Amino acid sequence: RGFWRGVFFYPVLLSPVVVALIWKWLLQSQGVFNAVLVSMHQTPVEWLTDGRWAFFWTIFVSIWAHMGFYTLILLAGLQAIPKDVYEAALMDKASPWRTLTRITLPLLMPNLIVVLVLAMIRAVQVFDEVFVLTGGGPGSATTFIVQFIYQTGFAEQIHLYGLAAAASLALAVGLIALTLLQLKLTHAKEAGQKVR
């Protein structure tokens, strides 16, 4: 049990740059994944230079790197559910599905909302993994908003500071809106009110 917690949480302890470098090593043209494909007499795949694959792997690496943190939040929520509630459901002969949908998920909802909002905020702010894995390419396949701000304001020959500042402001407003939504959902759930 402790081993699996460690396995899930370990990537959170690593720097996003280190995580991206490990995955870049695995996914590069001469990397481990292609070596396995070649050993099975398959054609190697350009994981990071094909737009579709690069987009998928960028998202996967970002999610994988933070999954342990989200799992920890959900595990804390599960452990906070009183055992008496499950015992009462067992005495009432509630099916496992009914126990899940009527007890576990409703009591876990505040934690699920926090995880959802944190994951959305992290998804919007992803930069390190993209910068190390693909640099925003191929083309603009993995250019997310923070990468766009960086490229527009600092990396290009012509620095478009106004456009980068406008994109930064839009990002800040979006993140504030997500945070306010999370607060509203959490407070409405705690008060037992219906969210409008």
Regions found by a protein language model. Name each.
Residues R1-R196:
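A structural signal for multi-pass alpha-helical bundles of membrane permease subunits
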